[in-house]
């Protein structure tokens, strides 16, 4: 049996643009993709912290160091510029591989610059945010 596991996430990024008429995808600063080990064309889920919307799309590389995180195509109806989002990548693996998995969690600031990279998906990324009291630290 294969399990679908979170392999990477870019946590609490700020949407810099939304383009309804662009071919669908999410444009992500190449530095963020590299830090998260997310490939160009890889399927990702986007969770909008601001409004609760969830969607799946694929990544395209944005200019390195630009901080770009652009929502393209029909998804622009669901996510607005300035929204805070989480990009999540998943992978399928055996139970043994899943138990050994150390996901890449990229924490960013409001300008989408990397603040920290770790393997704990429950770690609070910034002051004022807390780990759920129900979550077990990784």
Swiss-Prot record:
One of its GO terms (molecular function) is aspartate 1-decarboxylase activity. This is Aspartate 1-decarboxylase. One of its GO terms (biological process) is pantothenate biosynthetic process. The gene is panD. It catalyses: L-aspartate + H(+) = beta-alanine + CO2. The modification Pyruvic acid (Ser) is found at residue 25. The lineage of its organism: Bacteria, Bacillati, Actinomycetota, Actinomycetes, Micrococcales. Its main location: cytoplasm. Its cofactor is pyruvate. PANTHER family: ASPARTATE 1-DECARBOXYLASE.
